[in-house]
Curated annotation (Swiss-Prot):
A motif (D box 3) lies at residues 349-352. Signal peptide: none annotated. Residues 29-76 form the F-box domain. This is Cyclin-F. The gene is CCNF. The keyword Cell cycle applies.
Length: 788
């Protein structure tokens, strides 16, 4: 009963139960650990080994995945990490799990005794056996590329004592005799090594190894055997036809060299039973299978790199190739390797020259008989880098490129065209000149290599006033009409002849390609008069548009790069000198010797520059006899001559005193150069986790190194933001009119007089370099290969 005598019922109006409180459940926190294992594997793949160790320490489940799944280690990145006693277990584990990069770096580290210290006693034998193990593993993991490990153990070998290269070769041979599978590529590598000896017995052994390798399915060995038998097969019509059928089979399976040979063989298609149309279709398929690769992506990956820096690097590589007389193919392959590496991995500016010379060392070993030795390559950089720096960069390049050294280049397609359509020698030289000029400009890479080669040929024929610059035969062979080539021809002409070449910090234009083709064997084709832009447009039948030269960065906008200052340089003038002052216009500077310097050096410099080349200078992996370190010693003496007594006394001596070690029965004397060490900016070190530690590799090479003694020019500052010089010319939007096939007159330009020949060539010596040298591809590198 309520108040006032009112009786309340228990209805909803009179009585209210307390409302129930609903408790909200907290949402479940999802973490990376809740992802399926397949998703976790995709996350862990391609991480650096330091990141993998850091993730491993986070949770027991992640630790279980890292420790028990080989795919994590097979894809781990060892970029900028070199084997050392502190991280050896990590490299070994990754290599055994199928990591190509770890296997390559371990093989090179043991072969050159770099980073992994081994006692002097039986060093070559121990290192050779270990290197052969990891080289064999790397070759098995090498999928889709030609066998490559032979380039590290190719001759020369030491003639006395134990040689690490020879130990690797014998160990691999013993392995092939024991194993019945996975031997084809190893047998090919063994055959390539023996084929480089001039001994007739070794040549026979090499052929036997190639035959065994071909029987086990090695396509490269099959092609080499075909090439060696080609001359004999051509004498018999029946054998010739059978040989051609084998070549077509090799080309259909993807052998690039076989595809090139097949296209060139179509020049004699009637002898092979081929009609003209069938021959043209084979060549046309090769050209149409070529695709462009966007080299502008280099600058999106390399934030500190611009087109001028790349131009300077390539110009210097051209100069080295000219000095060493390397082929155009070797030069083009070197540049391709540089660009492919720059698209995949970040490179500081001070290591660009190291990257370039490392790529040249690799490419000369892969395709040339005369090679660039490691010690000579170090000397060519003015000792900016040490011996071990170059060895490690070679490992970085080969692993980053997955062992794929040989790729299609512009010069390959150019050679096919010049074989199929005979032309005057000067037209051939001009076409080659244009192809090498195209290496300097990344904007021209917007065109496929085959397209660029065809455009270079068309421009060469136009320049030489051909009645029909682009014949129906050339159209049928390439699949490109004259109208298809017009944009590329105009771009090529603008970049090669209209735009100004960049200058170094000495205000000297970089013209190494032009100097290369001023040689008499090229009939001094680079001195020839060229068509003006207006004459070219008239010859092509297109509307002329005004063009402005694309400015390159000036010396005030960029640090000194791959060049040395001309200050404190002595020069001796001679009458009838072929090069009055080579140091004033070359990218890798030289200084002529004064009378005092010539007296000090005598004939030592001539011997050092001439002898240390090719096979006889390639003792870098085994050590050289005392006195065999040639060019760096000459640089040392002249550097001291340039210094005043006060400067000389104040300089610090190198930390690395001469400590000769025996390897392959020979000894090295380390070049001790007084001066400041070039600065190195170490990258961030990966974290240390669990029982594995990465650690910083403080171990130097077991072989004596050539010291770096280039001081850093840190006082220079960069200017404003660089402007890209790789834009296509405005003439790309064209009024395409029919191409008129009639002769055109050349532009009348002043031709510089030929310099007088020198009866007594000057002695030259390199000056010290006073400046610190400072993505994965979206397409498979086999993209340019013909698929039949």
């Amino acid at each position: 009963m309520g108040s006032g005598g009112v009786i309340h019922c228990r209805c909803a109006k009179c009585f209210c139960y307390p409302s129930k409180r609903r408790i909200r459940r907290r949402p479940r926190n999802l973490t990376i650990l809740n992802l399926p294992e397949d998703a976790l594997f995709h996350i862990l793949k391609w991480l650096s080994v330091g990141d993998i160790l850091a993730v491993r320490a986070v949770h027991s489940h992640l630790k279980y995945l890292v420790d028990n799944h080989a795919s994590v280690w097979a894809c781990a990145s060892f970029q900028e990490l070199w084997p050392s006693p502190g991280n050896l277990k990590l490299f070994e584990r990754a290599a055994e799990k199928g990591n190509f990069e770890a296997a390559v770096k371990l093989g090179i580290a043991y072969l050159y005794n770099e980073g992994l210290s081994v006692s002097d006693e039986a060093r070559a034998e121990v290192n050779g056996l270990r290197a052969s193990r990891y080289f064999s593993l790397a070759e098995r993991l090498n999928v889709g590329a030609a066998p490559f490990i032979w380039l590290f153990i190719r001759p020369p070998w030491s003639v006395s004592g134990s040689c690490c290269k020879a130990v690797v070769h014998e160990s691999l041979r013993a392995e092939c005799q024991l194993q019945k599978t996975h031997r084809a590529s190893i047998l090919h590598c063994l055959g390539r090594v023996l084929s480089l000896f001039e001994d007739e017995e070794k040549q026979k052994q090499a052929r036997k190894l190639f035959e065994e390798s071909a029987n086990q399915g090695c396509l490269t060995s099959s092609y080499l055997l075909w090439e060696s038998d080609r001359r004999m097969d051509m004498l018999d019509p029946g054998r010739c036809l059978h040989s051609f059928r084998k070549l077509r089979d090799f080309a259909a399976k993807g052998c690039w060299e076989a595809q090139l040979s097949l296209a060139k063989a179509c020049a004699h298609g009637h002898q092979l039973g081929l009609e003209a149309k069938a021959s043209s279709e084979i060549v046309c398929q090769l050209f149409q299978a070529s695709h462009a690769v966007n080299k502008q992506r280099v600058f999106s990956v390399q934030k500190g790199l611009n087109d001028t820096m790349r131009y300077i690097l390539i110009d210097w590589l051209v100069e080295v190739a000219t000095m060493k007389d390397f082929s155009s193919l070797c030069l083009h392959l070197t540049v391709e390797c540089v660009d492919r590496y720059l698209r995949r991995r970040l490179v500081p500016r001070y290591r660009l020259q190291l990257l370039g010379i490392a790529c040249m060392v690799i490419c000369t070993r892969f395709i040339s008989k005369e090679i660039l030795t490691i010690r000579e390559a170090v000397w060519l950089t003015d000792n900016t880098y040490k011996y071990e720096d170059l060895v490690r960069m070679m490992g970085e390049v080969v692993s980053a490129l997955d062992g794929k050294i040989r790729v299609p280049t512009v010069v390959d397609y150019k050679d096919v065209l010049l074989t199929l359509v005979p032309m005057a020698p000067r037209t051939q030289h001009l076409c080659s000149f244009l192809c090498e000029l195209s290496l300097l400009h990344t904007s021209l890479a917007a065109y496929a290599p085959a397209h660029l080669a065809a455009a270079a040929l068309l421009l060469a024929r136009l320049t030489h006033g051909q009645t029909q610059p682009w014949t129906t035969q050339l159209w049928d062979l390439t699949g490109f009409s004259c109208e298809d080539l017009i944009p590329c021809v105009l771009s090529l002409h603008q970049k090669c002849f209209h735009d100004d070449a960049p200058k170094d910090y000495r205000q000297v234009s970089l013209t190494a390609v032009k100097q290369r083709f001023e040689d008499k064997r090229y009939e001094e084709i680079s001195l020839e008069e060229v068509l003006s832009y207006g004459q070219l447009c008239a010859a092509l039948g297109v509307k002329q548009e005004s063009l402005e030269p694309a400015p390159f960065l000036s010396a005030g906008d960029i640090h000194a790069f791959l060049s040395s200052p001309s200050a404190r340089r002595t020069k001796r003038k001679r009458e009838n000198s072929l090069q009055e002052d080579r140091g004033s216009f070359v990218t890798t500077p030289t200084a002529e010797l004064s009378s005092q310097e010539e007296t000090l050096l005598g004939s030592f410099l001539d011997w050092s520059l001439d002898y240390c080349s090719g096979y006889e200078g390639d003792q870098e992996s085994e050590g050289e006899k005392e006195g065999d370190v040639t060019a760096p010693s000459g640089v040392l003496d002249v550097t001291v001559v340039y210094l005043s007594p006060e400067e000389h006394c104040c300089q610090e001596s190198s930390d690395e005193e001469a400590c000769p070690e025996e390897a392959c029965g020979a000894q090295d004397t380390q070049a001790l150069v007084p001066g400041h060490q070039a600065l190195r900016t170490p990258g961030p070190e990966p974290p240390l986790c669990s029982r594995w530690g990465l650690g910083k590799d403080v171990t130097t090479s077991g072989y004596s190194s050539v010291n770096s003694a280039s001081p850093t020019d840190s006082g220079r500052t960069s200017g404003g933001p660089p402007r890209s010089t790789s834009e296509l010319p405005t003439g790309s939007s064209l009024n395409t009119q029919p191409c008129h096939h009639h002769a055109r007159k050349s532009c009348l330009q002043c031709r510089p007089p030929s310099p007088p020949e020198s009866c007594a060539p000057q002695q030259q010596v390199k000056r010290k370099n006073l400046s610190a040298h400072s993505e994965e591809e979206e397409e498979d590198m086999n993209l340019g290969f013909l698929k039949l």
